[in-house]
Design a protein with these regions (language model features):
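CE4/NodB-like, metal-dependent polysaccharide N-deacetylase domain
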Residues: 75-97
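Active-site mouth loops of central-metabolism enzymes
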Residues: 66-78
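Generic alpha-helical secondary structure signal
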Residues: 8-11, 75
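Acidic (Asp/Glu)-rich catalytic clusters
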Residues: 10-24, 42-54, 90
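Structural preference for beta-strand elements that scaffold enzyme active sites
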Residues: 2, 22-28, 95-99
């Protein structure tokens, strides 16, 4: 079981995980918005991770992954991934792994 923090239904997922504490889960570190019509952006403010987002403030789609990789700043990717992990810990949940 994995939790994708940038996705819109994360609060519902957290609620379900809190109701089933015996369930092991991981944080699925996310930096791509896979669906062209159902998009998500960073947990970090977009202006703090400009290399990760497109002109609309969303993560790049899979179709634009080459463009994303060409401008990627590893420090921004680390900032975003840490924010996703910290967000989960702030809910009181304790993930067992990252994926």
């Amino acid at each position: 079981c994995s939790l994708m923090v940038p996705c819109p239904w994360r609060l519902h997922a957290v609620s379900l995980l809190q109701e089933t504490p015996e369930l092991s889960f991981g944080v699925h570190l996310t930096s791509v918005s896979e669906q062209p019509l159902y998009r998500w952006g960073p947990v970090t403010c977009a202006d703090k991770v400009p290399s990760l987002v497109d002109e609309q403030g969303y993560f790049y789609s899979e179709e634009r992954i080459d463009e994303s990789l060409a401008k990627l700043e590893l420090s921004e990717l680390e900032r975003e991934y840490r924010a996703q992990i910290d967000w989960v810990f702030a809910t009181g949940l304790r993930p067992t792994h990252l994926d």
